């Protein structure tokens, strides 16, 4: 994140003696940072030596297996009934991706009984359904429906669900996930025209310190593999930390939509950026207010980007063939837009109650076999219907 945060006990000066009470020895300092020593970092103070690992075991590979895309066409996927079960990490199913980003879903029914560390990617978990607690060495974050959980490289975390199940749309990338640069000044502060403010970002506000000894499983993802590390101490043994690298939460319900005289393009709704992709939030808002405005989007061609939309809630549900939890993929180079009759039907509308997450990628996406199993046939043909009373979704 672009702002500094500290939590817990810290020595007055970094890299100096920080002693435990009652002659208990030194706390162990760890510098955790990105891009060598040139990126954002945090300093953490542990009860135990961070490198202590009893045993290591390779569990398997994690690289997605992509299938032949077939003829280029618009596609839709019905995900409401994806299999549920397992913990959030185990339940994840990757549907599409490229070298810059993977997109998937998770529908867990239980909390994690191990710890997870993705050392090769940032992760962003959009909470569509459910609530719970994300615990990490940086502290505790409570999450609920609508929250984006942004988890940076190297975070050792565990997710505890509050209810019997949850549903997430998951973005994973080997680059940073951060607010768009155009929203920030040269010092990293969010500017007045940004659609959210630092006050909207929730950071860990309390530590959950453990000094337990025993056997604790940490599953480490790196080099497209998962390894099981058994520690002889609880990994959340941090008594204090400070810096710029830590997990955080932003709620889609805190996004401040921009409206205009005429239809606003999708970049207006951008929420985060990564390398070669953007993430946008479509939220309830007023429509355009020119007397001759057409609220439905104009037809457009993604000449250099693939567009993926995850439909969470709202008025898109009346659109032909699109339901809650569906995903659409509009690939490179093909025009898309309102279905027949939708443009005319939008005239006179004053607001929308839609809620959706969009990811635009600047390199083509590949599909997995899981995606093909969920595909809804005939989506490409929905533009062939006769004009009439149609429906529309204002994201495109």
Task: Place the predicted regions along the sequence by residue.
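Jelly-roll (double-stranded beta-helix
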Residues: 1-396
């Amino acid at each position: 994140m672009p702002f500094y945060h500290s939590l817990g006990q810290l020595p007055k000066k970094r890299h100096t003696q920080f002693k435990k009470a009652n002659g208990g020895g030194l706390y162990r300092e760890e510098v955790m940072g990105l891009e060598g020593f040139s990126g954002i970092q945090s300093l953490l103070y542990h009860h135990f030596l961070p490198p202590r690992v009893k045993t290591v075991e390779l569990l398997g590979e994690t690289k997605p297996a992509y299938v032949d895309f077939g003829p280029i066409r618009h596609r839709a996927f019905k995900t409401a009934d994806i299999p549920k079960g397992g913990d959030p990490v185990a339940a994840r199913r990757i549907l599409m991706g490229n070298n810059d980003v993977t997109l998937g879903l998770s529908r867990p029914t239980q909390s994690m009984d191990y710890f997870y560390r993705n050392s090769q990617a940032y992760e962003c978990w959009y909470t569509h359904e459910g609530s719970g607690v994300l615990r990490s060495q940086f502290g505790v974050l409570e999450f609920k429906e609508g929250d984006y959980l942004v988890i940076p490289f190297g975070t050792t975390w565990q997710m505890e669900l509050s209810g019997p199940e949850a549903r997430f749309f998951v973005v994973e990338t080997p680059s940073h996930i951060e607010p768009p640069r155009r929203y920030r000044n040269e010092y990293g502060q969010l500017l007045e025209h940004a659609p959210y403010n630092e006050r909207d970002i929730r950071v860990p506000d309390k530590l959950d310190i453990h000094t337990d000894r025993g056997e604790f499983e940490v599953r480490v993802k790196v080099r497209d593999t998962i390894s099981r590390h058994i520690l002889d101490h609880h990994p959340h043994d941090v008594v204090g930390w400070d810096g710029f690298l830590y997990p955080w939460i932003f709620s889609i319900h805190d996004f401040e939509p921009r409206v205009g005289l005429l239809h606003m393009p999708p970049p207006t709704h951008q929420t985060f950026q990564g390398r070669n992709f953007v993430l946008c939030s479509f939220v309830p808002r007023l429509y355009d207010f020119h007397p001759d405005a057409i609220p439905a989007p104009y037809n457009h061609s993604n000449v250099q980007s693939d567009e993926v939309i995850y439909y969470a809630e709202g008025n898109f549900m009346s659109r032909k063939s699109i339901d809650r939890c569906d995903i659409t993929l509009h690939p490179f180079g093909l025009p898309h837009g309102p279905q027949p009759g939708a443009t005319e039907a939008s005239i006179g509308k004053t607001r929308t109650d839609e809620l959706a997450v969009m990811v635009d990628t600047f390199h083509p996406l590949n599909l997995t076999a899981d995606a093909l199993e969920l595909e809804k046939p005939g989506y490409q043909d929905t533009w062939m219907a006769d004009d009439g009373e149609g429906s529309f979704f204002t994201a495109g």
